Amino acid sequence: NIANCIINTVQSNKITDLIVGIHHKANIVDTFLGGMITSLINGTSNQNLIIYGPKKPINSVKRLVVAVPQMAELEVGFDVWFDRIKNIASQLSIPVVFYANKNTTIALKKQCEIHSSLNVSFRELASWEDFLIISKHIKHGDTLIVITARKATLSYNNLFEKIPYY
């Protein structure tokens, strides 16, 4: 199937970043992510998987709003996804707002000191149960980026499963 072909290509070419579009549910029994993306999540382990659901052209984005789970700074991929967000914000010349708990915010601020050209701000997200609070601060022109983790990793939270329903 298509997912297996993609996984084989990713592994044989040592691809580190994979960007895929999210599908639109065809019927009520479809999952939010769809079978192919679910297979990609299960079939990859060392890749940065970016699932993108464009609602508007990327050049119309005015601000990135990034929700970061607690302990994300302890994950191997922390520097990688931060670098991707930094690159997007730099290329578009837009600000970034990070929502994270106190410890994760400290780590994010250290990363931002290295990249002083970034226009960043921080808001507290004490608990992932407060995820919906972010929606009150989303403005027209914002793009929401949700950092998640794979099951059985330090920053994984069972509440990630509910994100599609928000």
Over which residues does each language-model region extend?
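Catalytic cores of nucleotide-enabled group-transfer and carboxylate-activating enzymes in metabolic
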Residues: 1, 13-17
